[in-house]
């Protein structure tokens, strides 16, 4: 039959590529679960009173090429000026071998946080490299595997300083007056909720205040000056005051390590190591401390341990400090950090090595010296006599200078009184320096780069001798071996091959939404129009970004039912914090500052209580009933008891137990009745989009995990984006920014991230996803996520009981498999099943959350029936193996489950097990075989023998 042109054009082709099951597969799966259609299934599962009467107005789907063309036109409105603004952001030259083999490689960007170390050894090694770089450059004993950005790291440093301080009565934190303004902004915000007083002044004035528990210094100062803080930090140490230093990672290549000068905590942005500015992010922050403070440190830490065979293996160490275990008592609410960006920065150091980094840093400094010499020769006055890469130049008519710079396509720092700032970088050329001479001295400046270069050799050093680094850096072989592109490419490939990511198999982690990150969505993040903009450039140069953010915000308003979106939070945890801050500030604006109690169901994710504590709230736990639902009687009692102290409730929907609670609107009404606000955690938005919205349900604020629901990849543990949606009454109280004004936000509202729009350069991913799916496609995605979960639950429920179900025995987009009865009867645990799945070629589901002894499975809409059946068949085969243990065919201490996973090395070694080699390593055939590089990790050994630096190459 002849098809029409409209039929052949088929605008919805991307929807069919994003959604895994074909139409025929969907029909089969519906028949298995006992539903006639997707709409009928949703009617059985989602409470009728919260289902949307009409679809969200986000438009129809565009094809991949149409969406890319639209976004390219929007990106073209951004103007790519040379930005010498500095303030913690610099242009970079990302090595193409890293761009191609890491940033554009799904083996790196689709992986999850390495909770399962046996399938994560590649990126764990990459993160260990990053930690080694941090330790070497900071001169401290222990480093984390990244934080969200430099300003957030500063706030974490302040919080840590208070935790480790022996001055328990001190409540003041001193900040030197040459710290970056955006850093001070975020520190003030955090101090507000902790009840700390921020004191700003000259660094030496810190000694004048006896009530200070910690001090924040900056090396290099925001205006470019270098400091020798050795004497100051020695004096502070004598008074038991904690010294924190924000550092420039490139400058540290040449400068004395702050740890050697006496700093207790050192942090900064790793952006300069190969990561584009991206209008503010994402960028990894580095963070280091002294060994005696290791248990007070925030963020992930990678440690060296051993596996069951006694071989060296890596894992996340000291997890008991973190929110998923300690909840409101955690060191931080940080969950996702910036792993992909930390890996890029670490690999930048691996590729260039110590000598290459010294050349890069030395060239930047030399060009700065040449620029300084020329400007001085031309009659201009510099504010400082020492510098690394940044000059502050006195000018008579600042506006005229800035205007002339713009005419040259150049941005200078503009917020300094009677002066302009210039920060050079690795992308700066000789021609760029000549252009700066022309801007500041006129076209007839007559200066010659070569002559200036020769002349400055005879002048005083602009890095004082006492600040020059004397010790070696990056002496480990990993930083001295892979300097040819061939070797680097192979090293990156070897690491990626050790990991299990979405490019090999589904990752059925509950509460994580490991869906497709389509190639068309990823392409725009490498476009220079998005990658090269400075976050503090003039707004008229970022019209494309502003348009894209405005469109995306408009779509998210429709999809959430809220009135406004704040894009600043650069992780889900930051979104929670920002949303709770908005609630806190709203209450304060109504003279109800006494509202400090936050109700949280016992099933909540660990970030919820950790974020509430960070926002200055006290947590009251609400019970759940036997079905996993919020106990309304307990909620009503606790809301009533809280009375005028009730601030809010934090609730996840569908619940963390994987069901749509029928009484969610009543929950909202009860909290509102007692004057509280409803924070609806957006972790499970993938089961809401197009079906219902938080606003329609009755919530006041939510964060959205764009790295889950809206297709930004997890990157092995970051980047993330956690924008918040708010009702109109909360909109004035979302985070502001002291450097870049944000429309509609009260100017006094402090920031939660360094950049005004968070990790703006990954927002095109979510823009592309929504544009290519349209309203109907987004609804189908939610429906298919729900169908896939119910299909798994139906097929597995006889082998593994589904712990919680809703109406008609249905689950939402994820299901919890109860392993506890099996463990009681056979001794086989959820851990054994998780590790045995590796032999079948799968990443494990989420273990023991939200209920100990369970596995939580979330398939997402992107997995086909073929892949889901492969997972189900693996789980059923494992159940049969458990039966063989129960029947005594295999002993409890020697069977394929407790010995899992099995490695290639074990396959060729002597074999004394009561099961065959083939069953061990090819339980489901060889087509989808994944080979783990290590056996099961020894967690106890790793924490008892903490070692968080690179190990000898012979150990790998």
Swiss-Prot record:
One Pfam family linked to the record: GDC-P
Q: Which keywords does the record carry? A: Oxidoreductase, Pyridoxal phosphate
GO biological process terms, semicolon-separated = glycine decarboxylation via glycine cleavage system
* Alphabetical list of InterPro entries matching this protein: GcvP (IPR003437), GDC-P_C (IPR049316), GDC-P_N (IPR049315), GDC_P (IPR020581), PyrdxlP-dep_Trfase (IPR015424), PyrdxlP-dep_Trfase_major (IPR015421), PyrdxlP-dep_Trfase_small (IPR015422)
Q: Which cofactor does it need?
A: pyridoxal 5'-phosphate
Catalysed reaction, written as an equation: N(6)-[(R)-lipoyl]-L-lysyl-[glycine-cleavage complex H protein] + glycine + H(+) = N(6)-[(R)-S(8)-aminomethyldihydrolipoyl]-L-lysyl-[glycine-cleavage complex H protein] + CO2
What EC number(s) would the UniProt record show?
1.4.4.2
Q: Which GO terms describe its molecular function?
A: glycine binding; glycine dehydrogenase (decarboxylating) activity; pyridoxal phosphate binding
- List residues, modification N6-(pyridoxal phosphate)lysine: 708
Gene Ontology cellular component list: cytosol; glycine cleavage complex
Instruction: Note the NCBIfam families from the entry.
Output: gcvP, PRK04366.1
Q: How does it assemble?
A: The glycine cleavage system is composed of four proteins: P, T, L and H.
Say what the protein does: The glycine cleavage system catalyzes the degradation of glycine. The P protein binds the alpha-amino group of glycine through its pyridoxal phosphate cofactor; CO(2) is released and the remaining methylamine moiety is then transferred to the lipoamide cofactor of the H protein.
Which PANTHER family does this one have? GLYCINE DEHYDROGENASE (DECARBOXYLATING), GLYCINE DEHYDROGENASE, DECARBOXYLATING
State the name under which the record lists this protein. Answer: Glycine dehydrogenase (decarboxylating)
**Which organism does this sequence originate in?**
Pectobacterium carotovorum subsp. carotovorum (strain PC1)
């Amino acid at each position: 039959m002849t098809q029409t042109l409209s039929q052949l054009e088929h605008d919805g082709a991307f929807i069919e590529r994003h959604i895994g099951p074909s139409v025929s597969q969907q029909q089969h799966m519906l028949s298995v679960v006992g539903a006639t259609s997707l709409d009928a299934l949703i009617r059985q599962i989602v409470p009728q009173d919260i289902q949307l009467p009409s679809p969200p107005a986000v438009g129809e789907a565009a094809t991949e090429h149409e969406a890319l063309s639209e976004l390219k036109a929007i990106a073209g409105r951004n103007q790519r000026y040379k930005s010498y603004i500095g303030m913690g952001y610099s242009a970079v030259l990302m090595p193409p071998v890293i761009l191609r083999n890491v940033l554009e490689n799904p083996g790196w960007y689709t992986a999850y946080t390495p909770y399962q170390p046996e399938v994560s050894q590649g990126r764990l090694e990459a993160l260990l490299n990053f930690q080694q770089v941090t330790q070497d450059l900071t001169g401290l004993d222990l480093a984390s595997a990244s934080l969200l950005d430099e300003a957030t790291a500063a706030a974490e440093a302040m919080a840590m300083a208070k935790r480790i301080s022996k001055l328990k009565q001190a409540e003041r934190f001193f900040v030197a007056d040459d710290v970056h303004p955006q850093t001070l902004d975020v520190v003030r915000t955090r101090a507000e909720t902790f009840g700390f007083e921020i004191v700003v002044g000259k660094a030496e004035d810190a000694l004048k205040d006896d009530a200070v528990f910690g001090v924040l210094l900056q090396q290099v100062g925001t205006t470019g000056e270098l400091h020798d803080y050795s004497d100051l930090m020695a004096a502070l140490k004598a008074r038991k005051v904690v010294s924190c230093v924000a550092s420039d990672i490139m400058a540290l290549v040449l400068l004395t390590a702050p740890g050697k000068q006496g700093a207790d905590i050192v942090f900064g942005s790793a952006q300069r190591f190969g990561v584009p500015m991206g209008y503010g992010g994402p960028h990894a922050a580095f963070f280091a401390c002294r060994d005696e403070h290791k248990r007070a440190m925030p963020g992930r830490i990678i440690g060296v341990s051993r596996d069951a065979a006694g071989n060296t293996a890596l894992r996340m160490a000291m997890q008991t400090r973190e929110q998923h275990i300690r909840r409101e008592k955690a060191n931080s609410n940080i969950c996702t950090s910036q792993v992909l960006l930390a890996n890029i920065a670490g690999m930048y150091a691996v590729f260039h090595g110590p000598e290459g980094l010294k050349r890069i840093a030395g060239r930047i400094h030399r060009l700065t010296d040449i620029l300084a010499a020329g400007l001085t020769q031309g009659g201009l006055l510099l504010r400082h006599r020492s510098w690394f890469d940044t000059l502050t130049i006195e000018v008579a008519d600042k506006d005229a200078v800035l205007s002339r710079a713009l005419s040259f396509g150049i941005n200078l720092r503009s917020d300094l009184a009677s002066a302009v700032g210039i920060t050079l970088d690795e992308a700066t050329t000789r021609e760029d320096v000549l252009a700066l001479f022309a801007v500041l001295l006129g076209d007839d400046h007559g200066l010659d780069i070569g002559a200036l270069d020769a002349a400055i050799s005879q002048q005083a050093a602009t890095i004082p001798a006492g600040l020059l680094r004397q010790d070696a850096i990056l002496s480990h072989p990993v930083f001295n071996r892979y300097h040819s592109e061939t070797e680097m490419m192979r090293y990156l490939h070897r690491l990626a091959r050790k990991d299990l990511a979405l490019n090999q198999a589904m990752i059925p982690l509950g509460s994580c939404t490991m869906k497709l990150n389509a190639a068309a969505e990823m392409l725009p993040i490498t476009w220079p129009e998005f990658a090269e903009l400075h976050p503090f450039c003039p707004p008229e140069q970022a019209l494309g970004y502003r348009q894209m953010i405005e469109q995306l915000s408009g779509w998210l308003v429709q999809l959430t039912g809220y009135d406004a979106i704040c894009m600043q939070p650069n992780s889900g945890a930051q979104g929670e914090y920002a949303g709770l801050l908005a609630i806190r500030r709203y209450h304060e604006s109504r003279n109800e500052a006494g509202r400090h109690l936050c109700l949280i169901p016992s099933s909540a994710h660990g970030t919820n209580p950790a974020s509430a504590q960070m926002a200055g709230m006290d947590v009251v736990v609400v019970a759940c009933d036997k079905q996993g639902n919020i106990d309304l009687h307990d909620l009503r009692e606790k809301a009533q008891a809280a009375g005028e102290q009730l601030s809010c409730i934090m609730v996840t929907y569908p619940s963390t137990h994987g069901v749509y609670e029928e009484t969610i609107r009543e929950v909202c009404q009860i909290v509102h009745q007692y004057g509280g606000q409803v924070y609806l955690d957006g972790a499970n938005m993938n089961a809401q989009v197009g079906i219902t919205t938080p606003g329609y349900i009755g919530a006041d604020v939510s964060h959205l995990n764009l790295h889950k629901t809206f297709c930004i990849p997890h990157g092995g543990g970051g980047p993330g984006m956690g924008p918040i949606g708010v009702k109109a009454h909360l909109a004035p109280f979302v985070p502001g920014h002291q450097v870049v004004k944000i429309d509609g936000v009260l100017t006094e509202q402090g920031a939660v991230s360094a950049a005004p729009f968070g990790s703006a350069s990954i927002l095109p991913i979510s823009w592309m996803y929504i544009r290519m799916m349209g309203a109907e496609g987004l609804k189908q995605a939610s429906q298919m996520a729900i169908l896939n979960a119910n299909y798994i639950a139906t097929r597995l429920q006889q082998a593994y009981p589904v712990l919680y179900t809703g109406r008609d025995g249905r689950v939402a987009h994820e299901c919890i498999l109860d392993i506890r009865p099996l463990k009681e009867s056979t001794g086989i645990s959820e851990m054994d099943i998780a590790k045995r799945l590796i032999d079948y070629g799968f990443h494990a589901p989420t273990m023991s959350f939200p209920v100990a002894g369970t596995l939580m499975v979330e398939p997402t809409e992107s997995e086909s029936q073929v892949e889901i059946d492969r997972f189900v068949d693996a789980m059923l085969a494992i159940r049969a193996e458990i039966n063989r243990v129960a029947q005594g065919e295999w002993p409890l201490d020697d069977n394929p489950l407790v010995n899992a996973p099995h490695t290639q090395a074990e396959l060729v070694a002597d074999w004394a097990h009561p099961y065959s080699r083939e069953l061990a390593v090819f339980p489901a055939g060889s087509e989808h075989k994944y080979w783990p590089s290590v056996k099961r990790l020894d967690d106890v050994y790793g924490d008892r023998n903490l070692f968080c630096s690179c190990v000898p190459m012979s150990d790998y």
